[in-house]
């Protein structure tokens, strides 16, 4: 399917893979055990297709996912996801070296609460400390970016990695910020965030989706919201700082 789409569209493209799309060959490889070996086939295929790869860690759909991963107070579960994310960054670094172009790895975790919690500050402090540990390893062939979300299904009351949390973290630590157009209030103009964030973060990663009432990922249209987003990048002279 990807090859068919690639054959119909002009220009060159990048493919963003989640860790769960590794080629595991029927072997039971848990997420804290994954290595670049599970992605060498993707790397070679992308080279043949004249495409570059980007990457994502995957915190959801796992027995240890629950409602908290990197912000989990249980050290055993938290360390499992920290190790997973560290390994994903190393895989991204190997991809970047292979394709002679930095692989951008997005970190989004589903962490949150279905109902009101009094532990908001505690969970966010744990998430901060986890990210500090993960991002401490310097890897020259990849870039990391962090993605916020308003809420998720089953986690309606509270999201640990909110826009405020990640905007502050990225600004303080000089990390790329991910803007997903489906991760904000339906009445918000995500384009308004571009000029503000660019004053404080080095680069932006854009996930351009089309939400209906929530993060529904309808097929993207060249509508006013999409047009405004890219117009703001042009006005900010920041096309070279957005991905």
Where would I find each of the regions flagged by the language model?
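Short glycine/threonine-rich loop-to-helix capping motif typified by GTGT followed
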Residues: 27, 118-121, 157-161, 191-192, ...
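Active-site acidic/histidine proton-transfer and metal-coordination neighborhood
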Residues: 32-54, 58, 62-176
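Acidic, metal/ion-handling microdomains and their immediate structural contexts
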Residues: 170-173, 186-188, 192
